[in-house]
Every structure is written in structure tokens, then in C-alpha cells.
Amino acid sequence: MKHYRFLVSVVVIGLVTAWMLISAGSALAQRDINRQFVSAPSTGIVTVYTAKKILTMELSNPDATAVAVEGKHILAAGSLDEVKAALGDRKFAVNDTFQSKVLLPGLIDQHLHPFLGALTLSTEVISTEDWVLPGRTFKAANDANEYISRLKSADAALKGKNDWLFSWGYHLLWHGKLDRKALDAVSSTRPIAVWQRSCHEFYLNTAAIKALGFTEEAMKGKGDASTMMNWEEGHWWETGLNLIMEPLLKVFATPERMVFGLKQMVAYLHQNGVTAYMEPGALITPDIWKLYQPILGSDETPFYSYFVVDARSQVDDGLGLAESLAATEKQVALAPQGKVSFIPKQIKLFADGAIISQLMQMKDGYTDGHHGEWMMTPENLDQRAQLYWNAGYQLHIHVNGDLGLDVVLDILERRMRETPRANHRTVIVHFATSNEEQVARIARLGAIVSANPYYTVGFADKYAQFGLGPKRADAMVRSASVLKRHIPLSFHSDLPMGPSSPLNFVCAPSIA
């Protein structure tokens, strides 16, 4: 697989999330919350920006070479002559700053996680790829020796002997086996917590386990969670994380760390041209809103933040069906409105485990004999899907493996048979592995696809060698198959699963 690269030289104009254009008239744009390219809002001054090409994303007028902007509104787009004609006798100034550039509307990351993005990227990042952040770049660690060396350097750099060392980005296939013993060799006294690259696993050394007050006995008898941990190795994954996260977050997700991480994430998204994002599966309490609003809701933050309620946590918390629906409606009702808000009548459900951990459910298993996991059992997923389907919700269903996709499509088929809904737009989220028959079923059932194309760039080559084999790894994220069947398709980063860099994601699916 070739390395991805930029195909065009692009400048993102402003932070307008959509274009509403005509060829010889005026049109309004959605509210612009970044004034970088807008001249003196509310003064009546019109600026006409010229460009080599403007990709409008409007089917009736896909290309332009000039766009007229006044304050928060896009007035017209087309050729320079067409724009002048549309403006009539209104005064305007022509700005040729982008004359040799290609312009895009503001970019939307359809699926990312601000809480995870803030936490992961505020740790010592030692990952499988470079992470270019505002003011700092974390280079990739390419093998086990390099990984452990970087971890030891991070330990040595900490001043306080009792300070925690938090790191994110570890992956078995790049960095070799990691366990409690290996972390104890880095430090037997400093608490160390390593967050696996997928964010679905944690490794703790003995000092961290003692600092958090965990005991082996307390880890037993907790249902599925107790089957997804290894005490001796200091390893917790998927549902097993429920056993450790509350105490761990008290020392990890401190207000100081979260404020730093969120502000860094705002700068990171802005430098990559993101103008809006959604987090499907948000766990937001009143305290989280208090943290988010001053930062994400600030007038100075140049993008919108939208959220969809998480249904998996309702199962984990033991809520019944009626209680779950009421809890969802309450969470949306209590949320603020404006730049930071919940989207009503939408819900996030989960099928199988993370692809980055190779814990998705595969019909033909894995080449090394390990097995995948369910984030929600098929039975729970079916019940919750039926609950929210019957209540008129749009379903967003996380699924990565082809076996997981079979389960999701079977559930969707039952919903359509029992309670048909037109234009339900159920979202197949991530869409890592599939076959052509499954893509055809997606089309027949009226679902849509939100895919993560970074899987093919970041992981396919390694998975061809380990776990999946080349036949399945080389066919991950079948975007072309989706488009051939006229299924609506969007891309997302799932930050921090992939970098939130939409221009790179434009390139990723076309390279094999």
C-alpha cells in the first residue's frame, strides 16, 4: 500500500459549514463563526475572493472561481463576472489572496471524541504514527526497543518522584508485548498507566495498581467485565475497563489536564480546518458541560460541537428499557443549545470491539487464534435497537467486524420487518471489514455508512501480516462498493483513533 499524500493544494476559507449557492444571484450561508476571512462584519462591505478553483459541494453549481462574502453570509459564487452581476450596484472589493489556490468549504469531522482527544494528546504520546500537534510533534515509535526507550525517557523527565506517567499510543503489533512486569521494569515506584492505541485497553504497573487501591478479589464476579482483564499482566480491555475507570479518571482526568487538553484540541482542529464535529456516544454530566462550555462554547472557538447520547452506558448501569429512554430524553433536554449541543432523536449503539485492538468479531476468526469481543451483546443490542427504533430515533451503530456487521444487519432487517420506517438512515459506523453481499444488504435496508478510511492507511499493511491476512486486510473499508450502490457515505477520524485531518482522509480511500 502506498503512503497517502495530498492530491491538491487547498486553503480552507473561513469556517462556513455549508455552501448555498446560485450562479447569478444571492444566497445565504450558514452562520460563520470565524472571522478570519470576513471583512468587518455588519458594515455592509462585500469582499469578493478569487481562486483557481472553488469546490462548492453544491451539485447544481459544483465549481466556481469567485465567492462574495459579507459579514457572516456568503452572497454568491460563480465566475468573477457572474458574481459581479449578482452583486449589481453594491460596492465590493476584490481580494486575490487565494488566486492560485483551491478553496473548500469548512471541513466537518463527522465523528470524533473531544474527551478522549483531550486526554490522549495531553499524555506522553508514543504511538504507531507521528502526531503533529500545535507546538509539538510526537514522532512514531516503530518497534519494541524504541517504545520502551521512549517510555523510560518520559519517566526520567518527570520531576516529582510520585508523579504519574500517562502514555497513549501503544500497540502490540508495533511495540511488542506489554504487561505489568515490563512496566515495573521502567519504574517500580512511579505509577504508570499506558492507554492502548485504540483507547479500549489500559495497562498498569504495580505502583499504579497499589495507588488506586485495586485488589484481585475485587475484580472477580463482575460479569462480562471480569472476563476482560488479566490481573497478573495488569491489563484491562473493553468492558473490563468498567472495573478501573472511575478511580483512574480521578487522577488522570483532572480539571487541569482536561482544560489543557481541550484547549490543545481546539487549536489542533482549527489548524486542520475542522469547522464542526459530532461525538456519537457522548457521556456528558453537568460537570462535563461546565468544562466544555467555557472552551468549546467560547466565541473564540472556531467550530461547532454536536453530541449524540450513548446507549451502551445505560446497559452497563443496569437501566431498564423505559428508564433508558427517559434518561436519553432528559440528557438532551438538560443540555445547552447553540455551538455546543446534543442532537435530539439520535442514539449511539455498539456491536463488536475495536479494530485497532483487533477485537472486532470476524466470521473466519484471526490467523493467530485469538477472538473478538462484544461491546454490547447481540441480545442487548437487539433490545436497545428495538427500543429506540420504535421511538423514532436514528440509530448510529458502531461495528467493525464482518460477523458484527451480520448481527447489525440482521437486527436492522427485523426492525424493518416488524415496524417499517421510511428514510430511517441507520448509520453503519466505522465499517472496517465487510463483504460485497453485506454492502448490498446495507443498500436494500436503507442504511447509510460513516466509514473511517484511516484504517486502510494506518493499519491494513500490518493486519495483512498479523491477524487478518492480506485478503481481508486489503479490502477494509469498502468505500467504492458503497458508492457503487448509491449508499450515502461520509468519512470520519474517530479522533484519537485517527488524526482529525480531513484533507488526508480525502486521499486515504483512493490509495491502495
Question: Language-model features: where?
Answer:
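N-terminal Sec-pathway targeting helices
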Residues: 1-11
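Bacterial N-terminal signal peptides
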Residues: 10-23
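Divalent metal-binding segments
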Residues: 29-51, 55, 59-326, 345, ...
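Alpha-helix termini
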Residues: 157-159, 334-335, 415-420
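His/Asp/Glu-enriched, well-ordered alpha-helical/loop segment
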Residues: 260, 386-396, 400-426, 430-431, ...
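Acidic (Asp/Glu)-rich catalytic clusters
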Residues: 296-298, 332-338, 421, 442-444
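Conserved alpha/beta core surface patches that mediate binding of polyanionic ligands
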Residues: 330, 338, 342-345
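Ligand-binding beta-strand-loop-alpha-helix segment within the catalytic cores
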Residues: 448
